[in-house]
């Protein structure tokens, strides 16, 4: 890789590092008690550093909203913590992402950061091949 290709790669990595750095804590919807299915939780909180994702879990007619540790985002851990035997859940890592629509749609969305992380190596490889 020539000096120009290395400079371009360094520039891309620098932009990526600045873009992905987040100095603020994650913000999630959080209600101390489960809300009725027909209602939304509108209270938000800044999560502590050890709780790195937002959780929404539907169990029966109640919906739980809170900060959650992403590594603990499994049926077993969530059902044990919430004392629920049947639930549908979703964990996410974007501010205020724990909304009922993610449970209703059942899909996982890619964030802009994820897309940038996936595209950057291809762009760097393409630019390094230019003479």
Swiss-Prot record:
Removed propeptide positions: 106-131
- GO terms classed as biological process: negative regulation of activation of membrane attack complex
- A GO molecular function held by the record: complement binding
Q: Which UniProt keywords apply?
A: Cell membrane, Disulfide bond, Glycoprotein, GPI-anchor, Lipoprotein, Membrane, Secreted, Signal
Q: Any idea where the UPAR/Ly6 domain is? A: 26-111
Where a lipid (GPI-anchor amidated asparagine) is covalently attached, the residues are 105
- Gene3D superfamilies the record matches: CD59
Q: Does the keyword Nuclease apply?
A: no
Q: Which residues form the signal peptide?
A: 1-25
Tell me what this protein is called. Answer: CD59 glycoprotein
Which organism encodes this protein? Saimiri sciureus (Common squirrel monkey)
Q: What is the lineage of its organism?
A: Eukaryota, Metazoa, Chordata, Craniata, Vertebrata
- The gene name reads CD59
């Amino acid at each position: 890789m020539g000096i120009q290709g290395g400079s371009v790669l360094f520039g891309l990595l620098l932009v990526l590092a600045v873009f992905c750095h987040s100095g603020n804590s994650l913000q999630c919807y959080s209600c101390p008690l489960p809300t009725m299915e027909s209602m939304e939780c509108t209270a938000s909180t800044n999560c502590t550093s050890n709780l790195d994702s937002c959780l929404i879990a539907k169990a029966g007619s109640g919906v739980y909203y809170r900060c959650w540790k992403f590594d603990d985002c499994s049926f077993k851990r969530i059902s044990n913590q919430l004392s629920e035997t049947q639930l549908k859940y979703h964990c996410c890592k974007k501010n205020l992402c724990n909304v009922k629509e993610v449970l209703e749609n059942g899909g996982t969305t890619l964030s802009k950061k994820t897309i940038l992380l996936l595209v950057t190596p291809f762009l760097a490889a393409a630019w390094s091949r230019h003479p």
